[in-house]
Amino acid sequence: EPYRRQRQMCIRDSPYKPKVNFRIAHTKNSILLHFKVKEASVRARYGTDNGSVWTDSCVEFFSIPAGDGVYYNIECNCIGTILIGVGPTRNGREHAPKEVTDLVQRWSSLGDTPFEERVEETDWEVALIIPYAVFFKHQIESLDEKEIKANFYKCGDELQTPHFLSWNPIKIENPDFHRPDFFGTLEFE
């Protein structure tokens, strides 16, 4: 099945919008994510989990898996380095411990070695297998027949062309991905 184009929205007045496509699926014990990105430059300065990956070429999945208002931010740079946070609001988020981040299987078309910004058009992909145990503040046993609130993002805060894209529109003036009130709905079969 061909990739469906991600609904894109630049939430800051910026003419630059990289091309981003993604797929999401689930198994009996994991969420599967695959992002394809084409952008004018690419950077992967962070190679250790729970670092500032959003400043690199980064894709993100935010979700409320248990319907209780507590959301997880799973952020991944273009070499598969991740950050996982949890909490009800932007402030005071708790980072996942190493034993949790280590559960996420990752693959990147650019390998896993950090590098400074490469100013050239680059296509890259990243795939993640996120076991339900990554939602470490909850006991998620299955997503079968469930609806969850979520959003998908592409950013590059410190690239030569900073950008902030979201799948579900964020209807505020300044970019803020930590707005679960603007999450869309995912329906799992």
Specify the residue positions occupied by each region the protein language model found:
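Surface-exposed, glycine/proline- and aromatic-rich loop segments on solvent-exposed faces
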Residues: 14-90
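Single conserved hydrophobic/aromatic residue that forms the stacking wall/gate
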Residues: 1-11
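Surface-exposed molecular-recognition determinants
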Residues: 111-114, 135, 148
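Acidic/polar low-complexity flexible segments
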Residues: 50-59, 63-75, 138-189
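Beta-strand-rich interaction surfaces with strong enrichment in secreted/lumenal proteins
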Residues: 12, 20-23, 106-118, 174
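Generic short beta-strand segments
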Residues: 8, 36-41, 131-133
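Localized edge beta-strand/strand-to-loop motifs within extracellular or lumenal beta-rich domains
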Residues: 118-139
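An exposed acidic His-Trp-rich patch
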Residues: 73-119
